[in-house]
Structures are given as structure tokens and as C-alpha cells.
Amino acid sequence: MGVNVRPIIVRQEIRPETLRGRVLAVDANNMLYQFLSLIRTPDGVSLKDREGRTTSHLAGLLFRTTRLMVDYGVGFAFVFDGPPHPLKARVLADRRSAREKAMTEWGEALKRHDFQTAWSKAVVMSKLDQAMISDAKRLLSCMGMPYVEAPGEGEAQAAYMAAQGDVWAANSRDYDTLLFGSPRLVRYLTVSGREFLPSKGTSRPLIPELIELPCFLSHHKITREQFIDLAILVGTDFNEGITGIGPKTALKLVQQFGSLESTPDNIRERLPQDFEAIRGIFLRPNVRQDYSIVQRPMDEHCLFRFLCQERGFSPERVRIAVERLRAIAKSRQELGLVRWLGEHS
């Protein structure tokens, strides 16, 4: 879900081509969830293999990722969530309830042959389980793509990697990486440049965005600590927000009073009792420092065995992805040679 601060975000629209040669730390769970939600049959059922195992996320990971890399020259390091923080239990419970409600409504829509409604409810039913995550990691290994297993929040790990300068930016649809200290966040990096709206049965243009944390903080004349306090007022994955306080009101409060402790009594008494612990989640996140984002050669045999023999993918389609990976490897070799010649000329 993430924190809702969109109304106050300072963003700039960018062309995907401007990311050429950059490496992004991808919020892998967020990306895979998007694939699970949108890659479906007309009645809303996820793609599956002959054993009934979901493959929608694998199709998205293989074909859309390689397309972005070939078309725009961007690199990816995928970051997976570790065990959830105990304070996230409320959010996880809300998601379960929403899925259960959507499943009932999906079944009712199918009985009415209302496939548009069924499709929109199926999107909400999406659940990324450990088997799917294991399959995604296996696919990335076959592709030679780097991935990092975070000890806690994947967004915190991605932000750390960006802050260290090991990647250029974090890549997620949520804004939480900014709270965790990522200097840059890239949103809406897609192949089609459009977003499908299941409930309306239509789509809208989706333009990639770049958000730079220093620019955002400077624009609003706040610190990152105050940004975190603002998020706590609005609501995060670790606490419910205060009723009646949206992003704009929260911004005014932190600008006027400086911190949660200094807010008026009628605000302070409605704060979560553990707000200092929530601050700590963002300011002192649980991350790992021993990671590698080196891209390795793909293993073609591994790709065909896993996808075609075990998961029922078409060899012709997998061959397309293999050709893209070859092109990516060749491009990297040529770029490395150009850099070497430049350094030794």
C-alpha cells in the first residue's frame, strides 16, 4: 500500500531513454504483484501451467523486464522483502480481508457473465506467495540478473543501495523508499506507457516520473525526519493515520510545529503510542550491506528447462527473451570497451 503523499510530491516527468546506462534497485515484491494483478485471462484468472501453478509473474518478469532493458538500456537489481515487521500486521490483515471480499464478488460476477467486473475483482485477489517468489528468484538466476534478499523491508534495502551510490535510484510505485532515505525514486517505468484501470475497463497514459528527495525536502523546507513525522500523521504501513489529516494538512503541521512532540494536544493525543518506534523503522532500517549487483551471463539451458519443460512456456516466446538477453550482454560489452578506450586514450 505505502504512504499516501502524492498530493505534495514534487516530481518531474522523464523519458525512459534518460535512464540509459543507469541501474535501478527494483522493489521486486511490488513489481511482481503488478504482474500478478494485470497479466490475466479475460475472466480474471491468472496464467497457470499444467500443474496449476501461477506463471503470470514469470511472464512479466521475463518479457517486460528484458524489453525495458533492450529498448531503454536500463539495468535492474531486484530487491525482495524479508520477514515483515510486527507493526505491519494490521496492513497484512487488511489485505487478506480485501482479497476474501474480492473473491466472493469475483465469483458472483462470473455467474452473471459480467467479465469486466470479474476482472476488476480478480486484480484485488492477487496474492504473492513464497512459491511464486522462489520461482521468480530461480528465473532471475537463469537470466543472470542480480537480486538481493533484504532482511526486512525491501524498500528499505533498495533505498540503502541508492543512498550508497551502488544503484542510481529506487524503482517502485510506492513512495516509501523516500522515507527510507533513497535520494531518487523512479515510478511508472513501463513498456506500454499506459496503465490499465480494471474497474473502468479502460486505460490511461502513464508517464515515468523521477522524484528527488533533496529537491522535495528543499521545496517544502522540511527535513527527512519531519517528512517521516508527516507520514506518521497520514498513515504508513506500520500505523493508521489520524482521521481527517491528509498529506497537505500534515505538511502544514510539521512546517508549523516542527515535530510530532510539538503538535497541539488534540493532535498529539491521537498519535500512535509507538510513533518513536515507527520513526526508527524508517531512520534505522534493517538492511544488509553484503550484497552484489553484478549481472552474470544468462544460462540458456536453465531458462528453457525451467520455463518450457517445467512451466509450459512456448519455446518460441522464450527464444525472444533469450535474444534480448544476448543483445543486452553485447551492449554491455561494447559499453565496457568504449569506457576502457576512453580511460586509456
PLM regions: where:
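Conserved NTP-donor binding/palm subdomain of two-metal-ion nucleotidyltransferases/polymerases, i.e.
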Residues: 51, 177-180, 191-203, 212
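Non-catalytic nucleic-acid-binding/docking modules located in mid-to-C-terminal regions
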Residues: 3, 9, 13-20, 201-345
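Charged, glycine/proline-rich intrinsically disordered loops and linkers
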Residues: 104-120, 197-215
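Glycine-enriched alpha-helix->loop->beta-strand junction motifs that scaffold or abut catalytic
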Residues: 166-168
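Noncatalytic, basic helical substrate-engagement surface that gates or grips nucleic-acid strands
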Residues: 2-14, 18-164, 183, 191
